[in-house]
Amino acid sequence: MLTFSFLTLFPELLAPFASEALVGKARARGLLDVQLVNMRDFAENKHLKVDDTPYGGGAGMVIRVDVVERALASLPPADEVILLTPAGERFTQQMAEELSRTTHLAFLCGRYEGFDARVERLATRELSLGDFVMMGGEAAAACVLEAVARLVPGVLGDEDSHRADSFSSGLLDYPEYTRPAEWRGEGVPEVLKGGNHAAVARWRREQALARTLARRPDLLPSAGLTPQDSAYLLTLGVTPEQLAAWGAPPPPLPKRRRGAKPNPN
């Protein structure tokens, strides 16, 4: 069972993520567990103060490293101690899949001016959601919880669900539709209503390729493109030179008509 431990000054911010929706159901079924650790419980003063003024001066308060160390020591050893910080490496779907195969993840959620720099020695990994700054690490940690927990076997009702998600195939996800069949003049693509599973699969793959090309072309070099993908991308205006730069295979050769003789030229 995978356990998520969150070291925070505001456990009430994370409580809904731990008790509601699929994560809450997974906890009830014993598929995973979530522990909320209030770092104030490890302060050694009557006011439960966990921070102090920064050396060298400056605005704000800094969370003490000794408090964090005591809070971590109260937990069983973690496979990863993750510090949420704008300076960390960008969190990806690949990382989520890697983390889902562990048994215990501990998250350090900062506040105010952040942690004493020596907290980095307690972390095994530093993660960031992007190039922006939030008021604390709890929201970022909740995002990682959602991304990782859904990959734990049994958490999703349909085990194939996450395999078709954006990034799982290396591409953005294809568009999905449901009833009504028409809304404000926009209908559902006919191919999705025809019952031809091969045609639906081909349409979805092409839509994922088109979306990725338009919105995140940087993903294409690592998307595991096939010769058929290359052929479709050429119809979207991609050049053979671009395909070669991405490391994509060449499109399949046109099939020769049965009985046709090779052109001697």
Curated annotation (Swiss-Prot):
Residues 254-265 have a biased composition (Basic residues). It is an enzyme of class 2 (transferase). Keywords: Cytoplasm, Methyltransferase, S-adenosyl-L-methionine, Transferase, tRNA processing. It is found in: Cytoplasm. Residues 243-265 are annotated as: Disordered. Its main location: cytoplasm. Homodimer. Specifically methylates guanosine-37 in various tRNAs. This is tRNA (guanine-N(1)-)-methyltransferase.
